[in-house]
Amino acid sequence: MQAMKPRINHNRLDENSFYKNGHIHHVRVQDQTIGWVRRVDRSIRTTVEFVVNVLQDYLTDAECSDFDVSHNIKEYLLKIPVVKSLEEMEDYLKQIPDGNISSTLAHIVSIPLGIPIEPYDLLVTDYQDTLHSFIDKIDNQAVREYLLPKIKSLKIGYWCAYTFLPETINQFHPLYLSWLDNKRVFSPNTLQLSEETRDKLDNFLEMYDIPDIGFFSVGDNGSKIIGWDYNYYRHTFCYVNLHEASNEVRKVWEFANQHFHIDTDFEQLEQLEQLE
């Protein structure tokens, strides 16, 4: 067992001290600032590949399995600009038709499945409606008719690292986020953590000095973890180098599996890592 290391009390860090080495993007709902997120330099190519792979998986056993989703989706997504300022982001958002982005997150842009566009680490959007709008753009009718019913049962979200203003925590959709003892650790709300389990998980994270983590999640109840954001020591959350973080993350999920029955597929994680 490792010796306890001092952990930073994130609740005491103000906006400037927490992100003093990087750009800040305020999260606003209906013109109210409810938190802030850290700029994260992600690869658009990796994001697009992830979206394409998820959609393509649904076609594997279908009559239209030979259809290449990337023919439509990749080309469209790569046309999305990489904005360099909040002003550019807001200008871009004004051009998006109603219905293509969650109305409650009007200042935040996201592509299908809630995965963020570079360079911002963003919140989960209304993924079903957004994904629906992209599937509509596929020019093969058989593929469209096959995929559209699938997304009705698809549970997928993006958990990202950011700081809440405490008084506004309840404004977020409860399906996606659970708040564990005021720490930036997220899990599907469907897990219904008991107080005893929450304490065990919190103590476990403290004992091994595990960083706060964000997850990519798929499965019937968002139960299969296929990616995460991680970089505790620089207080910056970026796409993880699998080999640096695998031991720590395995510890967390070996523990979590005992209580939450989460199926963690590290083979998928390694495949996703290779896309970087």
Swiss-Prot record:
It comes from the Viruses. This is Uncharacterized protein L191. It comes from Acanthamoeba polyphaga mimivirus.
